[in-house]
Each structure stands twice: as structure tokens, then as C-alpha cells.
């Protein structure tokens, strides 16, 4: 069985991927503790608990993952001042922590979900909101790695 990490597995896309893949693969997932009740209780599911990025780094390095599917995000259509840190932490910082680890771990497949709002009205580099701008920025980090 392949070992797959799915981030954002309690969201709409991530939960559907988890449901579709869980019977055929070993699935690792990172979950905020307040979302644990939403998770499928399959024998193939491994939940990665962590309190900070250093702890996550140590745990990821012990895994031999084949694929990472990155669905985790913090979505806010019309952000407020207090949303900025949450958007940056979830949509840019967390993804970069993953990418840095995966680069060292030599994981071959990284699938990232983004948004069509990166190119609002069909115009390239015309983000609809801060959320879509953060997703676009993360795409640049993916290109770096």
C-alpha cells in the first residue's frame, strides 16, 4: 500500500479524497484537535498530532511517504484585520513547512489544491481577495522547491 499524507482532510475536498483513498492506501493526516470527530475511523488512517512545527518536522521525517496531497487552507472571502495572520499561517507558512520537509524526505509527488480566484475574471495575476492572493503566493514557493 502507498503511504499518502492528506492535509485538510476535514474540509470538503480533503474529506472526499480521504473517503476515496482510505481503503486502498495508508493515509496520514494532520488534524486540528477540534476537528477530530469529523475523521473517518479506518484502520488505514494515521493521525499526526503536533503542537508546533518542530514537532511536525520530527514526525514527518520518520514517515516514508509516497505522495502528499495538500488541501489545508484558511478560507475567508472578505477578510478582516484579525484574519491576516491566520490566512498567512495556514496558506503559506504551513505549506512551506511541508515543502521543506518533503524536499529532505525525497517525496516524489506533491499535489496542491488552489483556487480559480487566483485569476479573477480570467485575468492573470488578478487575485479576487487575500485568500486567493495567498494561494497564488504559495504557488511561487512550490516552484522554488
Positions of the model-derived regions?
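Rossmann-fold NAD(P)-dependent oxidoreductase module
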Residues: 16-20, 101, 141
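N-terminal Rossmann NAD(P)H-binding glycine-rich loop of SDR-like oxidoreductase domains
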Residues: 2-24
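NAD(P)H-binding glycine-rich loop region in Rossmannoid oxidoreductase-like domains
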Residues: 50-90, 118-122
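Conserved glycine-rich Rossmann-like NAD(P)H-binding loop of the short-chain dehydrogenase/reductase
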Residues: 25-34
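Active-site Tyr-X1-5-Lys
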Residues: 128-145
Amino acid at each position: 500500500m502507498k503511504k499518502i499524507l492528506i492535509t485538510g482532510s476535514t474540509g470538503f475536498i480533503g474529506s472526499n479524497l480521504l473517503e476515496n483513498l482510505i481503503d486502498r492506501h495508508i493515509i496520514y493526516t494532520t488534524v486540528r484537535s477540534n476537528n477530530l470527530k469529523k475523521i473517518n475511523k479506518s484502520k488505514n488512517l494515521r493521525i499526526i498530532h503536533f503542537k508546533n512545527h518542530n514537532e511536525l518536522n520530527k514526525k514527518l521525517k520518520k514517515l516514508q511517504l509516497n505522495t502528499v496531497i495538500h488541501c489545508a487552507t484558511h478560507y475567508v472571502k472578505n477578510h478582516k484585520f484579525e484574519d491576516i495572520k491566520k490566512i498567512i499561517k495556514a496558506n503559506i507558512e504551513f505549506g512551506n513547512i511541508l515543502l521543506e520537509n518533503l524536499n529532505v524526505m525525497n517525496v516524489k509527488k506533491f499535489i496542491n489544491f488552489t483556487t480559480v480566484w487566483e485569476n479573477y475574471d480570467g485575468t492573470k495575476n488578478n487575485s479576487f481577495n487575500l485568500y486567493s492572493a495567498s494561494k497564488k503566493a504559495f504557488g511561487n514557493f512550490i516552484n522554488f522547491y
